[in-house]
């Protein structure tokens, strides 16, 4: 990034609509690398730092010269990008051609370019002289869309902007797709990878390090938020390597079923049944692979105090919780906690079902659903929960609007948000004070993505208050090991540890290698100091103007401080005077700390901010019958 741009801003005010200094500095780098040099770039910015806005601002700027195709993982994220495009348009102080920007979900882009599962090569010519922006780039490969991107790259010779907060999803092998899309050089990955027997033993060798540095040098933009921009994190439980976890000792009932299921698992690291029984046991249903089975039984006894009928669980066991050591801890702990909770779990088969009836049985009511037994309240309102799974994508936006609303900062509208992997990327959660892992994530990337939904810039009004994180592990009743080093156990010894402990150790092994590679990417990230790129000058000047008039309501037209701020970029007194004249004649939009939304006006020898308020005729509906006419019905 261009550190020269960052140096233009002192004590940048982030609380108003603005473009952050690091975003402007990154835009400068993208323009030089992609627009000028036709090189691909990996935008490796840690979650919550504003990659989406950077990508959209870049798309707007280059839309004057090229067509831009933006690919996102799914329709919900497409809606997020479309919404943020409106924000980017309002922020950018530059010309653009919106018709040249096309945003697709990967599935819709696939359907546009395939006929009967075969790439339509004749139709690829339309992508000549284009730029592709790939959101969550680490997840797009290994399928037909990834294959299509490789074909377009080789056939059309177009540059790619790859967005990722975690470019290694599992092992270093997953980085190979990103390298291949960013380079014309063929790579034999067996030459750069050390392949062990276990997945966490896949390492990048010394030759691989050299290849990585050579191919990706000058093609990486790395950024992570400063500690001062985020709340601190407090991990709860006992020490486990470099973090803490909560040991949840299983009851005899849970441990018996847990051991029986484990004996039947050939490769338990990939067995969803182990995720099931680590969360909770359901007797005869522990090994089911089809949720429909849960809705077929009539009054089936699972345990003496737990039955299921038509998909409804009932019985005292939902309160005594011998079926789940994790929920026994969770239910007991939350009674003394205040604020909102975000709870990650794997919905392997029956996760969502067991959560629903445990919460209802313990007095917590379902958002827009059933009321809990002896319902608990906060400020006269029911304490409620919501469960997000892949089956509720269509209503997720409405749910998050309630959860993130200022009225819900205390959790009085929705206190507990349970979510499976659907919430692991691109979504933002606000004012979450407690983050729970009911299931141990499979990868370091997934773990970071889940934390990154909540712990991100602008998600907290008070960053002085810490965020609490609970990693829950279901363990045997007699397990009490202190794990302080990855060298504590041999591979054979790891295999007989409780499933969650084994999974955590695997995660930490993979994390160690991932962090090593991330350090390499950080080291080859590009930083420089230059005047702003010509295509970004107006955007930089616009942000300098916004920052200045946040603090000032009225200044002389030749105010030395204002003049100096603008002239540092233009380096021409005449050009600076013309710019100041243009923004007053054009009534540039600013946010002032006194008057809030305002426009700039010239008043005699002064420049003043004039607050405004939009008003409009009230209509119940309007129909655009023709482009020239609108017909409306007044209220």
Swiss-Prot record:
Residues 32-185 form the Helicase ATP-binding domain. Transmembrane segments: none annotated. GO terms for molecular function: ATP binding; DNA binding; helicase activity; hydrolase activity. It is an enzyme of class 3 (hydrolase). ATP binds at residues 45-52. The keyword Cell membrane does not apply. A motif (DEXH box) lies at residues 135-138. Keywords: Activator, ATP-binding, DNA-binding, Helicase, Hydrolase, Nucleotide-binding, Transcription, Transcription regulation, Virion. It is found in: Virion. It comes from the Viruses. One of its GO terms (cellular component) is virion component. Pfam families: Helicase_C (PF00271), ResIII (PF04851). The keyword Hydrolase applies. InterPro entries: DNA/RNA_helicase_DEAH_CS, Helicase/UvrB_N, Helicase_ATP-bd, Helicase_C-like, P-loop_NTPase. Its EC number is 3.6.4.-. Its main location: virion. Heterodimer of a 70 kDa and a 82 kDa subunit. Part of the early transcription complex composed of ETF, RAP94, and the DNA-directed RNA polymerase. Belongs to the helicase family. VETF subfamily. Acts with RNA polymerase to initiate transcription from early gene promoters. Is recruited by the RPO-associated protein of 94 kDa (RAP94) to form the early transcription complex, which also contains the core RNA polymerase. ETF heterodimer binds to early gene promoters. This is Early transcription factor 70 kDa subunit. The gene is VETFS.
């Amino acid at each position: 990034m261009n550190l020269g741009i960052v140096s233009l801003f002192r004590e940048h005010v982030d609380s108003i609509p603005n473009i952050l200094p690091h975003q402007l500095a990154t835009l400068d780098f993208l323009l030089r690398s992609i627009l000028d040099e036709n090189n691909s770039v990996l935008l490796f910015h840690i979650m919550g730092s504003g990659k989406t806005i950077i990508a959209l601002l870049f798309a707007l700027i280059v839309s004057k010269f090229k067509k831009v195709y933006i690919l996102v993982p799914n329709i919900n994220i497409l809606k997020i990008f479309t919404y943020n495009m409106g924000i980017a348009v309002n922020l950018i102080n530059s010309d653009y051609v919106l018709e040249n920007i096309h945003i697709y979900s990967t599935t819709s882009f696939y359907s546009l370019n395939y006929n009967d599962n075969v790439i339509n090569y004749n139709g690829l010519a339309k992508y000549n002289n284009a730029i592709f922006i790939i959101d969550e780039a680490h997840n797009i490969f290994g399928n037909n869309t990834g294959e299509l991107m490789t074909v377009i790259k080789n056939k059309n010779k177009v540059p790619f902007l790859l967005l990722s907060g975690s470019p290694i999803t599992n092992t270093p092998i997953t980085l190979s797709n990103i390298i291949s899309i960013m380079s014309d050089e063929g790579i034999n990955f067996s030459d750069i990878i050390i392949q062990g027997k276990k997945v966490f033993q896949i390492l990048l060798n010394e030759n691989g390090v050299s290849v990585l540095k050579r191919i990706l040098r000058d093609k990486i933009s790395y950024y992570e938020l400063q500690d001062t921009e985020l709340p601190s994190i407090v991990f709860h439980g006992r020490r486990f390597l470099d973090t803490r976890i909560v040991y949840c000792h299983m009851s005899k009932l849970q441990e018996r079923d847990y051991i029986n299921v484990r004996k039947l698992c050939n490769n338990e690291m990939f067995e969803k049944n182990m995720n099931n029984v680590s969360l909770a046991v359901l007797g005869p249903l522990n090994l089911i692979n089809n949720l429909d089975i849960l809705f077929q039984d009539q009054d089936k006894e699972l345990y003496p105090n737990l039955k299921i009928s038509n998909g409804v669980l009932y019985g005292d066991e939902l309160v005594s919780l011998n079926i789940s050591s994790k929920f026994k801890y969770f239910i007991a702990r939350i009674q003394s906690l205040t604020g909102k909770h975000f709870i990650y779990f794997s919905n392997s088969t029956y996760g969502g079902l067991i959560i629903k009836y445990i919460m209802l049985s313990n007095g917590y009511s379902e958002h827009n659903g059933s009321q809990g037994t002896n319902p608990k309240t906060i400020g006269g309102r029911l304490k409620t929960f919501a469960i997000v799974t892949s089956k509720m994508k269509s209503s997720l936006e409405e749910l998050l609007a309630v959860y993130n609303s200022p009225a819900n900062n205390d959790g009085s509208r929705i206190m507990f948000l349970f979510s499976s992997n659907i919430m692991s990327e691109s979504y933002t959660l606000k004012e979450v004070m407690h983050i729970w892992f009911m299931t141990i994530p499979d990868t370091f990337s997934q773990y970071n993505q889940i934390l990154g939904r909540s712990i991100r810039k602008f998600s907290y009004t008070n960053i002085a208050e810490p965020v609490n994180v609970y990693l829950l592990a279901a363990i045997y009743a007699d397990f009490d090991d202190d794990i302080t080093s990855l060298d504590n156990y041999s591979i054979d010894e790891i295999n007989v540890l409780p499933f969650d402990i084994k999974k955590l150790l695997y995660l930490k092994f993979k994390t160690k290698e991932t962090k090593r590679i991330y350090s390499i990417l950080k080291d080859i990230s590009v930083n420089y100091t230059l005047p702003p790129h010509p295509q970004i000058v107006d955007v930089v000047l616009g942000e300098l103007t916004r920052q200045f008039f946040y603090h000032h309501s009225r200044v002389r037209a030749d105010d030395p401080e204002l003049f100096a701020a603008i002239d540092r970029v233009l380096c021409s007194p005449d050009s600076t005077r013309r710019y100041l004249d243009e923004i007053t004649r054009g009534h540039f939009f600013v946010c002032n700390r006194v008057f809030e939304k305002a426009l700039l006006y010239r008043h005699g020898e002064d420049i003043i901010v004039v607050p405004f308020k939009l008003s409009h005729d009230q209509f119940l509906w309007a129909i655009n019958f023709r482009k020239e006419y609108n017909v409306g019905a007044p209220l």
